[in-house]
Amino acid sequence: MKESEKVVEAKLREAVKQRGGVALKILSQYHAGLPDRLVLLPGSRAFFVETKSTGCKARLLQKKAHEMLRSLGFSVYVIDSTEKVSDLMQLIDLERLGL
């Protein structure tokens, strides 16, 4: 089933909030292509998330921005469904536990 970017982003915000964190919206008129959200979680954990409608991919400009952020040592995730939000949060929880 196709989910809108708005639905995926809302699920991400709620999942991050449940873990005591915030998913800050990034609005940059000076650097196009940055991910939609900067996620900050307890324990000094920070990563970027690009949300998309189901089946949609990052544009070339976005991919270049993601690579720039990764080259600086940040994790960048592109998710296009609420199921992938759940998968990402499970991965983050496992990393927090050192597994």
Name each model-derived stretch.
Residues M1-L99:
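Catalytic phosphate/metal-binding cores of nucleic-acid and nucleotide-processing enzymes, i.e., regions
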